[in-house]
């Protein structure tokens, strides 16, 4: 199980007291969607998943885009396909969050890669602006109670 699925499993187990119904050793797209749906069925869990995605994107952006490019398990590419995101992520605020990320600079791998090869100051300013916008969405009721 790769790093992010393992992390998702850990979060779920901690909150729910038991692991997912299955622990695939090689996760394909269909299994990943099932896994996400199981996780998102818990109203407590989606905030932790939201944080997980933040961590994936912000802490090691170059590593993440390389992962998308090189991985045989292409399920993480779901994150850059708005139609699939909308179809599979039914919790409103999580969907708003992901769509918000897509609208900023996760629209395509090329745009993502271009952004992260920009000068550090430009990246920092963009992330600060993005965080303020997301905070405003939450403040205005984008976050579920």
Curated annotation (Swiss-Prot):
It is found in: Virion. Keywords: Late protein, Virion. Induction: Expressed in the late phase of the viral replicative cycle. GO terms for cellular component: virion component. Belongs to the asfivirus K145R family. This is Uncharacterized protein K145R. The lineage of its organism: Viruses, Varidnaviria, Bamfordvirae, Nucleocytoviricota, Pokkesviricetes.
């Amino acid at each position: 199980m790769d790093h992010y699925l393992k992390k998702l499993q850990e979060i779920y187990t901690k909150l729910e007291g038991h692991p997912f119904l299955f622990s695939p050793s090689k996760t394909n797209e269909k299994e990943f969607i099932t896994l996400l749906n199981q996780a998102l069925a818990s109203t407590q869990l989606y905030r932790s998943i939201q944080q997980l995605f933040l961590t994936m994107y912000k802490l090691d952006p170059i590593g993440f885009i390389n992962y998308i490019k090189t991985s045989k398990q292409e399920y993480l590419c779901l994150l850059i396909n708005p139609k699939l995101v909308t179809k599979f992520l039914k919790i409103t605020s999580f969907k708003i969050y992901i769509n918000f990320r897509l609208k900023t600079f996760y629209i395509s791998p090329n745009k993502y890669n271009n952004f992260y090869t920009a000068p550090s100051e430009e990246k920092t300013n963009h992330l600060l602006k993005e965080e303020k916008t997301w905070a405003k969405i939450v403040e205005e009721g984008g976050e579920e109670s």
